[in-house]
């Protein structure tokens, strides 16, 4: 089984927010069952920016120290998630896909399809209400548990 986590789901997990427990249950089960977990390359870029910003605001004022800590955290992220990619043709497809009102969600959806994921796990299921669910099921973390 292959699971794709959108950016907000991963942020909730890393920041121990409202849905962190449900996501952790999924990740533990995924590890136990040898399921593959994916995030998009765009999510990885966003996480890099947000984690560094968070470190800066939480006492890591020294750039070298902050980057070292950032590298540790990102290495942990990469030990949990594979990276699903999209190519320029996919980007053009998303730009011209009027069924999505949020292009970033379309990129996430396309990355999940490219990785042949069975599930796209999101906190904003309404953002994917027009997505074709023939090949992928779109659910919230609590639905999966």
Predicted regions and their residues:
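Short beta-strand segments at enzyme active-site cores
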Residues: 39-44, 122
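Short, well-structured N-terminal submotif of metal-dependent ribonuclease cores
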Residues: 1-39, 54-60, 145
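Acidic, PIN/NYN-like endoribonuclease modules and their adjacent C-terminal/linker elements
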Residues: 2, 29, 110-145
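Active-site-proximal, substrate-binding regions of enzyme catalytic domains
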Residues: 20-24, 31, 42-99
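Conserved beta-strand segments of alpha/beta enzyme cores
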Residues: 36, 82, 135-137
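Short, flexible helix/strand-to-coil boundary loops that buttress conserved ligand/catalytic motifs
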Residues: 14-15, 51, 98, 132
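Active-site neighborhoods of divalent-metal-dependent phosphate/nucleic-acid chemistry enzymes
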Residues: 79-125
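A generic structural signal for short hydrophobic patches within well-formed alpha-helices
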Residues: 10-11, 44, 128, 144
């Amino acid at each position: 089984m292959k699971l794709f986590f959108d950016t907000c789901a991963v942020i909730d997990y890393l920041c121990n927010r409202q849905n962190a427990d449900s996501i952790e249950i999924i990740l533990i089960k995924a590890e136990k069952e040898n399921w593959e977990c994916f995030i998009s390359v765009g999510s990885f870029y966003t996480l890099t920016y947000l984690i560094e910003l968070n470190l800066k605001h939480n006492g890591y004022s020294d750039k070298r120290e902050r980057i070292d800590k950032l590298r540790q955290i990102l290495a942990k992220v990469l030990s949990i998630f594979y990276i699903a990619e999209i190519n320029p043709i996919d980007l053009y497809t998303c730009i011209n896909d009027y069924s999505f009102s949020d292009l970033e969600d379309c990129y996430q959806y396309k990355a999940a399809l490219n990785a042949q994921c069975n599930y796209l796990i999101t906190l904003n299921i309404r953002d994917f209400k027009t997505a074709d669910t023939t090949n992928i099921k779109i659910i919230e973390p609590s639905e999966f548990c």
